[in-house]
């Protein structure tokens, strides 16, 4: 008789019976453990492997390593996201002005409706008035008086800001470029006084003489009300073939710039409460000033959006490059002039050679302000071209000069730290 089912083939059927129906097995005979058996019994069983994640979680919660020893704490995802958020907030605070300017331009390019409506109600004039009102509120007389010690360096800085650097405008006007407003705007930028806040802030960061920086900033902007119209008429009007209304421009700058500065300064000096409030909320006033300044390019770009979109990216890149080269030229000129002046003075240590004075002059005298340029463009009413095209390259130049000078300040600080460590 042929056997069709071998007995070994029936084992799988028996093993497939549910667990509940199986007969209980007798415990195996005890065996002596071997080395391999011990290792497999430690690493092999499933219930021990399942316990390891629980041990690791308990160790992380208690600040210990999974092996039981105290180790370095691993940063939790919530802590990592919190530190990233703090870093982003810190970056936004330290770079609020460039970010606000970029945001204003981007908003105008996406939807110009609100910007055109703001122009209809002359919002840019009120924003400019507010900027210089804040400048007057934050201006300290005591700090201005402290700069008298370095008056030769301050005098050179003022001459560089108001006389020497505007001279470059006539060479920039010789560049043949389309649209011509880009080059005209950069030439006008050369004729402006120094920045209202960034030069002083960077001087303070690098350990320069803040009082000297403040003095040059305040005096150059006040004198600029009288000198800027003359510089524009001489270097820009002749090159552009137009006659600028110098007297009208001077009166408008007095109304838009000088009067709000005087009002702010008088309010600060006559009321200790106002002065204390302003000094205690410097960050808030700085943010407010940046927001007011960002409204201007937002309005100008909204008006000129169709023209800006017709400009080739290559042309804009060339204008940005010219602005960067212009700032490098101003830095090189001021640094070289200070070096020469320090060699000419033989008695003791020259004020031109002292780092705290030299750095203040280099930073402040090499920067140009955007609000005064905007006020000038607003008052000219298109005499030199489309307002938006005049302002756009200057906004880029303003942002680039802050970035470049921030890099220089960081390099100076690192070098000072190396010298201090070497001592």
From Swiss-Prot:
The keyword Transmembrane appears for this protein: yes
Transit peptide: 1-55
Topological type in the membrane: Multi-pass membrane protein
Main location: membrane
Region listing for Disordered, in residue ranges: 23-45
Chain ranges passing through the membrane: 96-116, 123-140, 153-173, 182-202, 212-232, 244-264, 284-301, 315-335, 389-409
Pfam family, one: SBF_like
Localization of this protein: Membrane; Plastid, Chloroplast envelope
GO CC annotation terms, alphabetical: chloroplast envelope; membrane
Keyword line: Chloroplast, Membrane, Plastid, Transit peptide, Transmembrane, Transmembrane helix, Transport
InterPro entries: Na+/solute_symporter_sf, Put_Na-Bile_cotransptr
Functional summary from the UniProt entry: May function as sodium-coupled metabolite transporter across the chloroplast envelope.
Family membership: Belongs to the bile acid:sodium symporter (BASS) (TC 2.A.28) family.
Protein name (database record): Probable sodium/metabolite cotransporter BASS4, chloroplastic
Organism: Oryza sativa subsp. indica
Gene: BASS4
